[in-house]
Amino acid sequence: MPYVTVGQENSATIDIYYEDLGAGQPIVLIHGFPLNGDSWEKQVLVLLNAGYRVITYDRRGFGASSQPSSGYDYDTFAADLHTLMTKLDLQNTVLVGFSMGTGEVTRYLGKYGSERVQKAVLMAPVPPFLLKTNDNPEGVDQSVFDGIMKAIVDDRPAYFSAFFKEFFNVDVLLGERISNEAIQASWNVAAGASAKGTLDCVPSWLTDFRDDLPRIDVPTLIIHGDADRILPLESTAARLPKRIKNSQLEIIPGGPHAINWTHADQVNPLLLNFLQ
């Protein structure tokens, strides 16, 4: 199993698990919370068939990567991505983030620039800024995130069960675009994640990306479902085209948060067309 070492805690190294498949222009897929690189299954198959080199990796604390007690912030997440990009010497890369993974894409480009990056894709994005403040009235009250953290501490497995119902819009899409088996598979991955990492990721969602967005200087595709209950369109993606030059927003009608799974039949053609 391939790993890249990104740090050390006490006597143990902090290692990021990745998969590097195929040949051609590199596409780096960055997963959402609380999943791992396997959540890109429906995109990996299509991208490999289209002749791309596809790299997935597990964020620290999740999947097969190390589960350290710290580093669950976007400066560290972006540094982990930078280490991977440097080790693999990726050039002309397309960075594709889903949900929490869009934070890595945004902070990476804001901090490290686009020397290694040709294009970017933000699916169901976290940016620009989730927290409601005086200068960000479109955000969400802090009390909502406090409630999430309490639910994780009280009963993390039960929190995941409730989370995935809204993640996939189960009440509407079960049996049509999502199966019980797929939901259970996602729950299993989430349950295996770091308890500390799961909790510490919540404050990271409140990162203010507004200064990073104008620094994105590559063509950027934004995709969002108009029925997203986790990150509503109006608070997130709808605010990005004015902040990212050379960007385009594509809206998936009826799409929940997990559009890369439930609406892969619509997401994948948009992705392939943008890559060409």
Curated annotation (Swiss-Prot):
AB hydrolase-1 domain ranges (all copies): 26-263
Active site: 99, 228, 257
Name the UniProt record assigns to this protein: Putative non-heme chloroperoxidase
Phylogenetic classification of the source organism: Bacteria, Bacillati, Cyanobacteriota, Cyanophyceae, Synechococcales
Family: Belongs to the AB hydrolase superfamily. Bacterial non-heme haloperoxidase / perhydrolase family.
Species the sequence originates in: Synechocystis sp. (strain ATCC 27184 / PCC 6803 / Kazusa)
GO molecular function: chloride peroxidase activity
Pfam families, per the entry: Abhydrolase_1 (PF00561)
Sorted UniProt keywords: Chloride, Oxidoreductase, Peroxidase
InterPro entries listed in its UniProt record: AB_hydrolase, AB_hydrolase_1, AB_hydrolase_fold, Epox_hydrolase-like
Enzyme Commission number(s) from the entry: 1.11.1.-
Catalytic EC class: oxidoreductase
